[in-house]
From Swiss-Prot:
Domain of life: Bacteria
NCBIfam families assigned: PRK00029.1
Catalytic activity entry: L-seryl-[protein] + ATP = 3-O-(5'-adenylyl)-L-seryl-[protein] + diphosphate; L-threonyl-[protein] + ATP = 3-O-(5'-adenylyl)-L-threonyl-[protein] + diphosphate; L-tyrosyl-[protein] + ATP = O-(5'-adenylyl)-L-tyrosyl-[protein] + diphosphate; L-histidyl-[protein] + UTP = N(tele)-(5'-uridylyl)-L-histidyl-[protein] + diphosphate
Organism the protein comes from: Xylella fastidiosa (strain Temecula1 / ATCC 700964)
Protein name, entry field: Protein nucleotidyltransferase YdiU
Positions annotated to bind Mg(2+): 271, 280
Gene from which this protein is expressed: ydiU
E.C. code: 2.7.7.-, 2.7.7.108
Record has Magnesium as a keyword: yes
InterPro entries noted in UniProt: SelO
Alphabetic keyword roster: ATP-binding, Magnesium, Manganese, Metal-binding, Nucleotide-binding, Nucleotidyltransferase, Transferase
Binding site residues for ATP: 100, 102-103, 123, 135-136, 193, 200, 280
Length: 519
């Protein structure tokens, strides 16, 4: 492993805030120099061995005091030059101006074993000029959620930032979890998150909003050179190709979310990755009973802007915001509009691909989308678990004597189950008729469905149980969840409990059904 060689291309190329202080302020440059604030008693709670291997960390190094000191913000490896990035964003549809890394500090870039440079960030490492008066810390509950979900999403095959380590600080912070006037102390923690780039849509929106076209252009050209080196050309042609690829990646990302039932919860433009990664895990969730209007974010319960079924439309809207920010670099809007159309075409193609895979078809035709939507309607009206519905369908055969037995574990309400049984049986008859003309062999169909329909997803109630145990010093569930989520598509003997539907006690419990942005 040693010596680690850190790169700092972002700060080497882009302009720096001349003021070196933690004073909250408007910053006109791309980044500010800032060091992590030390913590009193750092303790390693968990790490990802896969991410560590990519970054060339030896297994022995991960449990050394030096590693814990560095990734708690108490020390630096040689070559690290910590900084916070400046950006803005649209939040819940409104432009809010400068935001920036309010509690995230980038340590630098490290060349991975796969030949890719990765940025390493500490989330919860203390205040920065962008903290807006906050303490820059993160609570243990939100840190566990980000750590686990980063790794779970990766193993589901969904583009995402990763997590190297989760470290308790030994300190507490005051948070009002539900924003209801009841602040309380909570343990704090720090996550080291890892990605090739943490640049987001809001990185470009901020200078554009200020009319700083020079900085906007410099940011665009830096991002293309570093993060899109396969693109060639110059000027508007290059910029157009770049924007089109961002649209493509974003469409693929959201299609993956919809495939597994993931709800991001806070799709603000400052939470949209320029690489098409899932980024900034806050009040996310997986839909249990199939409700397209469900949002896990308690802040969003009135408008439901970021509800499950709206995610493709929100992604398109966010790309429109990015297009408007980039418009000063183009002579007309045609290239940007072409990129937005690329999003639509890519998403529709991905939706068809995923519907075919989830239903076990060789290809997806228009009538198959109707069949897919009809199943979603059935799931909603019968209050069926999305994950378990598709999992059961993967084991179904038309000659089964009791056609609904495959879904015995998927129903949340027996009354609704009985009421909708005729509709479900009718749907299965239509499905059987479609299978009879599909060219896929039975074994290939089952395997195709197995790879598209996860058995294990990071349900909020599972995460909440791990959080409550960890707050009492018991890390057993945290480590068990991390292990289970490494193989989400496989049957795991002895881990059946992690594949069960949400228990009734978790239906309306805070942390299990609804979450806030408090972290």
């Amino acid at each position: 492993m040693w010596p680690l060689r850190f790169n700092n291309r972002f700060i080497d190329v882009l302009p720096c805030d001349p003021e070196v202080s933690l004073r909250s302020r408007q910053v006109l440059e791309a980044w500010s120099r800032v060091a992590p604030t030390p913590v009193p008693m750092p303790c390693l709670l968990a790490y990802s061995s896969e991410v560590a291997a990519i970054l060339n960390f030896d297994a022995e190094e991960l449990v050394t005091p030096r590693f814990v000191e560095v990734f708690s913000g108490n020390a630096l490896y040689t070559g690290m030059q910590p900084y916070a990035v400046n950006y803005g964003g649209h939040q819940f549809g409104q432009w809010v101006g400068q935001l920036g890394d309010g509690r995230v500090i980038t340590l630098g870039e490290l060349l991975g074993a796969d030949g890719v440079y990765y940025e390493l960030q500490l989330k919860g490492a203390g205040p920065t000029p962008y903290s807006r008066g906050a303490d820059g810390r993160a609570v243990l509950r939100s840190s566990i959620r980000e750590f686990l979900c980063s790794e779970a999403m990766h193993h589901l095959g969904i583009p995402t930032t990763r997590a190297l380590s989760l470290i308790a600080t030994g300190d507490t912070v005051i948070r009002d979890m539900l924003y209801d006037g009841h602040p309380a102390p909570e343990p704090s923690a720090i996550v080291c998150r890892v990605a090739p780039s943490f640049i987001r849509f809001g990185t470009f929106e901020l200078p554009a909003s200020r009319g700083d076209i020079d900085l906007l252009r410099r940011l665009v050209e830096f991002t293309i050179i570093r993060d899109y080196p396969h693109l060639h050309g110059a000027g508007e042609t290059l910029y157009a190709d770049w924007f089109a690829e961002i649209c493509t990646r974003t469409a693929e990302l959201v299609a993956h979310w919809m495939r597994v039932g993931f709800v991001h919860g806070v799709m603000n433009t400052d939470n949209m990755s320029i690489l098409g990664l899932t980024i900034d895990y806050g009040p996310y969730g997986w839909i249990d009973n199939n409700d397209l209007d469900w949002t896990p974010n308690v802040t969003d319960v009135q408008s439901r802007r970021y509800r499950f079924g709206a995610q493709p439309q929100v992604a398109y809207w966010n790309l429109g915001c990015l297009a408007r920010a980039l418009a000063p670099l183009f002579s007309d809007a045609a290239s940007l509009q072409a990129g937005l159309e690329r999003f639509r075409a890519t998403y529709l193609a991905a939706e068809r691909r995923d519907a075919a895979a989830k239903l076990g078809f060789a290809a997806c035709f228009d009538e198959d989308l109707e069949l897919f939507d009809a199943l979603r309607t059935c799931m909603h009206q019968a209050e069926m678990d999305m994950t378990l519905t598709f999992l059961g369908l993967a084991d179904w055969e038309p000659n089964m004597p009791d056609s609904l037995s495959l879904w015995a574990e998927a129903f949340y309400d027996p009354v609704k189950r009985d009421a909708q049984a005729p509709m479900l049986r009718d749907w299965l008859q239509r499905y059987a008729a479609r299978l009879s003309v599909d060219p896929l062999p039975v074994a290939e169909r089952h395997e195709r469905m197995r790879l598209a329909n996860p058995r294990y997803v990071l349900r909020n109630y599972l995460t909440q149980q791990a959080i409550e145990c960890a707050e009492q010093g018991d890390l057993t569930e945290l480590h068990a969840l991390l292990e289970v989520m490494r193989r989400p598509y496989d049957f795991q003997l002895g881990r059946e409990a992690y594949a069960m539907r949400r228990p009734e006690w978790a239906r309306s419990r805070i942390g299990c059904s609804m979450l806030s942005c408090s972290s």
